[in-house]
């Protein structure tokens, strides 16, 4: 069926329509929070396909999370262009790398490391650092993984690591000399085990396209038109890969928001967004400024913060007026959490759906304290963090037991009881939300008349599909998330806790005066991201000294 180009444009506002009409690249879209950027870029692809400017089979639409890629695919299907390849940068690179591996590299394809934990633990042992680095310290091991990932996506070799660290605005929490030892050991172990990590996928695919002319020509023939979402968070190696895909052509549309650059610790840089028009002087620049998410009151505070840092596109709120964001101070963390939980309980009692509420914090440690309090009060919740759901130890152990039990299938009517029985031992302690979500998924499937077969094997098939799409199950409960993990999400009511000096902006020493301007700027962007997750109500709390960002956003004097 032919696409109706006029109908595609009717659903857009003036700025979004300008994006859709810019069917020839290069195009740069500066899109503020909640301005409908996904709508704009998917309609651009659909409109270009409807008028014959783009062949949808030759479009590669890139984003940075599986959830965002899935949303993009769903919207493109609805618009009548289901053949567009909408993928994460990593999945697109991995697909190409594995396809060409036998002819380019030869031998068996390497194993993909989805979690660095065991490799890093062995690296600590090989480097002889067990006396100074505890592999049981999850936060420390996560910091080490982050530093190695930063080095690799920034294309920094172990021998150059210390020199590059000295130039970095945000210093590592781990001793640089030890990091070099661990980085070297980690790379050696991977080579020995014939394994690659996600950073290797980007590096190897980039090198393959640069060095293998036949491969490059085949890939460039397959993909002619490019869309890159969240372009403010691109890393040097990701830009290198995009350059290899694009070649000498200019049919590219990038979308980003300088005010939401919050991943510098992972190698992301707004440099490529900010210099796009220098690389493509003929580029059309379009700004999306109508905010459809938040009330005018929340938008006003967010705009005030933007002006301080000259960070990005100011927004004009589309929605009706609501209540002004509230700010409340407490003497300590315990009283702060008690106050927040009291407000949440009142909302739930008044009929607010729990899935409309989120508690956002700067650090995982803050969320752990909230978890303990919610468990004590019996308030249901789920945690969203940057750790991949299906890589969690409790989730993997639970699914392993389900697989073992599925060998001897239960009767159709009994499978959900067996799943419940397997889950029961896991539903103790503090972090039970992952298993609870998997059990909730089972109940939903059991009640679905279209789900078949109603067995543990059928359940596992659904879970495996979700693993492939990185689409974890959720529950209708309150969400707890770090500010980094909350990016791209929204809730009716948001509680942003810990808006205190020393926490937001975060400092290891407790002395905010020691922070550089660059670090403060990124922390300010994090605060902006947190504020703009709220649709109707924003409640901000602090303890001791209020964050400077509260004054900058005019929420306190």
Task: Give, region by region, the residue ranges found by the protein language model.
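Conserved beta-strand -> loop -> alpha-helix junction used to position metal-binding or nucleic-acid-contacting
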Residues: 83-97, 115, 377-401
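ATP-hydrolysis module of ASCE/P-loop NTPase motor domains
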Residues: 103-195, 291
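Conserved helicase NTPase motor core
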Residues: 5-21, 25-33, 40, 60, ...
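Conserved helicase C-terminal RecA-like lobe
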Residues: 371-373, 392, 397-556
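Conserved two-lobed SF2 helicase motor
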Residues: 85-91, 197-205, 475-484
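Conserved AAA+ ATPase "sensor/coupling" helix adjacent to the nucleotide-binding pocket
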Residues: 100-101, 122-127, 301-310
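P-loop NTPase Walker
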Residues: 1-106, 110-111, 217, 247, ...
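Helicase P-loop NTPase motor core
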Residues: 29, 33-41, 282-284, 290-379, ...
């Amino acid at each position: 069926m032919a696409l109706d180009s006029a109908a595609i444009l009717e659903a857009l506002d003036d700025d979004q329509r300008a994006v859709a009409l810019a069917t020839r690249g290069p195009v740069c879209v500066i899109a503020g929070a909640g301005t409908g950027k996904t709508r704009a870029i998917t309609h651009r692809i659909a409109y270009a396909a409807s008028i014959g400017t783009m062949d949808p089979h030759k479009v590669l639409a890139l984003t940075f999370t599986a959830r965002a890629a899935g949303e993009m695919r769903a919207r493109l299907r609805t618009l009548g262009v289901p053949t567009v390849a909408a993928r994460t940068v990593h999945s697109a690179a991995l697909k190409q790398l594995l396809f060409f591996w036998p002819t380019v590299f030869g031998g068996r394809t390497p194993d993909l490391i989805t979690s660095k934990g065991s490799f890093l633990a062995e690296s600590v042992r090989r480097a002889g650092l067990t006396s100074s680095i505890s592999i049981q310290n999850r936060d420390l091991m996560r910091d080490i993984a982050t530093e190695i990932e930063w080095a690799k996506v920034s294309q920094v070799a172990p021998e150059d690591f210390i020199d590059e660290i000295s130039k970095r605005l945000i210093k590592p929490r781990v001793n640089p000399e030890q990091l070099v030892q661990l980085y070297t050991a980690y790379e050696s172990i991977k080579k020995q085990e014939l394994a690659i990590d996600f950073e290797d996928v980007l590096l190897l695919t980039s090198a393959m396209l640069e060095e293998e002319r036949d491969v490059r020509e085949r890939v460039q023939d397959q993909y002619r038109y490019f869309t890159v979402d969240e372009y403010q968070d691109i890393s040097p190696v990701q830009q290198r890969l995009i350059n290899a895909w694009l070649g000498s052509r200019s049919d590219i549309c990038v979308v980003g928001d300088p005010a939401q650059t919050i991943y510098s610790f992972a190698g992301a840089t707004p440099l490529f967004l900010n210099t796009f028009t220098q690389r493509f002087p003929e580029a059309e620049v379009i700004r999306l400024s109508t905010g459809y998410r938040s009330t005018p009151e929340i938008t006003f505070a967010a705009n005030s913060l933007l002006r301080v840092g000259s960070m990005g596109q100011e927004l004009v709120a589309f929605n009706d007026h609501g209540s002004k964001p509230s700010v409340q101070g407490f003497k300590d963390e315990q009283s702060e959490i008690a106050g927040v939980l009291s407000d949440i309980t009142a909302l739930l009692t008044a009929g607010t759906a729990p899935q409309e509420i989120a508690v956002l914090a700067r650090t995982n440690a803050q969320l752990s304290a909230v978890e303990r309090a919610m468990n004590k009060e019996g308030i249901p919740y789920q945690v969203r963090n940057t750790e991949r759901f299906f890589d969690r130890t409790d989730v993997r152990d639970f699914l392993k037991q389900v697989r073992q039990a599925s060998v001897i299938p239960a009767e159709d009517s009994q499978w959900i009881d067996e799943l419940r029985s397997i889950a029961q031992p896991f539903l103790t302690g503090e972090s039970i939300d992952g298993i609870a979500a998997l059990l909730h998924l089972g109940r939903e499937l059991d009640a679905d008349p279209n789900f078949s077969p109603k067995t543990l094997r059928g359940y596992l098939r659904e879970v495996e599909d979700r693993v492939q799409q990185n689409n974890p199950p959720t529950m209708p409960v309150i969400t707890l998330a770090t500010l980094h993990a909350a990016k791209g999400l929204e809730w009716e009511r948001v509680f942003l806790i810990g808006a205190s000096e020393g926490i937001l902006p975060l400092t290891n020493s407790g002395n905010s005066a020691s922070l550089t301007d660059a670090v403060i700027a990124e922390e300010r962007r994090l605060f902006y991201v947190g504020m703009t997750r709220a649709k109707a109500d924003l409640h901000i709390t602090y303890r001791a000294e209020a964050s400077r960002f509260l004054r900058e956003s005019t929420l306190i004097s």
